[in-house]
Amino acid sequence: MASQKRPSQRHGSKYLATASTMDHARHGFLPRHRDTGILDSIGRFFSGDRGAPKRGSGKVPWLKQSRSPLPSHARSRPGLCHMYKDSHTRTTHYGSLPQKSQRTQDENPVVHFFKNIVTPRTPPPSQGKGRGLSLSRFSWGAEGQKPGFGYGGRASDYKSAHKGFKGAYDAQGTLSKIFKLGGRDSRSGSPMARR
């Protein structure tokens, strides 16, 4: 008798489980049925169209609106990761285009890579060539006043704004000037006010 009741209880519990999941699916309580469009669109937003299924492409009208706050170089079809990689390679290729044919045979690729990373920071004219990466670098440096990024235009501002500090700090480099001025600005020029 006990062996006959157990399978009947199992069948009953299975039936109840399937009925409850179907009931949840009908009313939309399972996150699987409700969130697939949002998750697909988020995945497509970050990884591009290659990995996401095509079924939700027509159902999400706000996907194009959510891309609008991005900069104009990231709006085209491939994913954001590819665009940033492309803009990075574009800046290095444009910056080293005349020398590239000579460098690749003579130098180690690692040395070539490090030279390409270091060179776009020092000359300000290279900012016009590689638009996406250097513009983001420049604006980031202007907002956060980070020393390595975009100090080309900021150094002249510092020089013109702080002419009173010139005497002792003229012999030092630009980076040390920015560090010293940043430290003094954060302490809110109290020595100048006392003088």
Curated annotation (Swiss-Prot):
<dbReference type="GO" id="GO:0046689">
    <property type="term" value="P:response to mercury ion"/>
</dbReference>
<feature type="site" description="Cleavage; by CTSG">
    <location>
        <begin position="114"/>
        <end position="115"/>
    </location>
</feature>
<dbReference type="GO" id="GO:0005516">
    <property type="term" value="F:calmodulin binding"/>
</dbReference>
<feature type="site" description="Cleavage; by CTSG">
    <location>
        <begin position="138"/>
        <end position="139"/>
    </location>
</feature>
<feature type="modified residue" description="Omega-N-methylarginine">
    <location>
        <position position="44"/>
    </location>
</feature>
<dbReference type="GO" id="GO:0034115">
    <property type="term" value="P:negative regulation of heterotypic cell-cell adhesion"/>
</dbReference>
<dbReference type="GO" id="GO:0050771">
    <property type="term" value="P:negative regulation of axonogenesis"/>
</dbReference>
<feature type="modified residue" description="Omega-N-methylarginine">
    <location>
        <position position="50"/>
    </location>
</feature>
<feature type="modified residue" description="Citrulline">
    <location>
        <position position="184"/>
    </location>
</feature>
<feature type="modified residue" description="Phosphoserine">
    <location>
        <position position="57"/>
    </location>
</feature>
<dbReference type="GO" id="GO:0043209">
    <property type="term" value="C:myelin sheath"/>
</dbReference>
<keyword id="KW-1003">Cell membrane</keyword>
<comment type="similarity">
    <text>Belongs to the myelin basic protein family.</text>
</comment>
<dbReference type="GO" id="GO:0034612">
    <property type="term" value="P:response to tumor necrosis factor"/>
</dbReference>
<feature type="region of interest" description="Disordered">
    <location>
        <begin position="45"/>
        <end position="79"/>
    </location>
</feature>
<feature type="modified residue" description="Citrulline">
    <location>
        <position position="26"/>
    </location>
</feature>
<feature type="modified residue" description="Citrulline">
    <location>
        <position position="32"/>
    </location>
</feature>
<feature type="modified residue" description="Phosphoserine">
    <location>
        <position position="101"/>
    </location>
</feature>
<keyword id="KW-0069">Autoimmune encephalomyelitis</keyword>
<dbReference type="GO" id="GO:0005886">
    <property type="term" value="C:plasma membrane"/>
</dbReference>
<feature type="modified residue" description="Phosphothreonine">
    <location>
        <position position="21"/>
    </location>
</feature>
<feature type="modified residue" description="Phosphothreonine">
    <location>
        <position position="18"/>
    </location>
</feature>
<feature type="modified residue" description="Phosphoserine">
    <location>
        <position position="139"/>
    </location>
</feature>
<feature type="modified residue" description="Phosphoserine">
    <location>
        <position position="186"/>
    </location>
</feature>
<dbReference type="GO" id="GO:0000165">
    <property type="term" value="P:MAPK cascade"/>
</dbReference>
<protein>
    <recommendedName>
        <fullName>Myelin basic protein</fullName>
    </recommendedName>
</protein>
<feature type="modified residue" description="Phosphothreonine">
    <location>
        <position position="104"/>
    </location>
</feature>
<feature type="modified residue" description="Phosphotyrosine">
    <location>
        <position position="15"/>
    </location>
</feature>
<dbReference type="Pfam" id="PF01669">
    <property type="entry name" value="Myelin_MBP"/>
</dbReference>
<feature type="modified residue" description="Deamidated glutamine">
    <location>
        <position position="172"/>
    </location>
</feature>
<feature type="modified residue" description="Phosphothreonine">
    <location>
        <position position="36"/>
    </location>
</feature>
<feature type="modified residue" description="Phosphoserine; by UHMK1">
    <location>
        <position position="190"/>
    </location>
</feature>
<dbReference type="GO" id="GO:0061024">
    <property type="term" value="P:membrane organization"/>
</dbReference>
<feature type="modified residue" description="Deamidated glutamine">
    <location>
        <position position="127"/>
    </location>
</feature>
<dbReference type="GO" id="GO:0032570">
    <property type="term" value="P:response to progesterone"/>
</dbReference>
<feature type="modified residue" description="Citrulline">
    <location>
        <position position="154"/>
    </location>
</feature>
<feature type="modified residue" description="Phosphothreonine">
    <location>
        <position position="119"/>
    </location>
</feature>
<comment type="subunit">
    <text>Homodimer.</text>
</comment>
<keyword id="KW-0597">Phosphoprotein</keyword>
<feature type="modified residue" description="Phosphoserine">
    <location>
        <position position="20"/>
    </location>
</feature>
<keyword id="KW-0488">Methylation</keyword>
<dbReference type="GO" id="GO:0071944">
    <property type="term" value="C:cell periphery"/>
</dbReference>
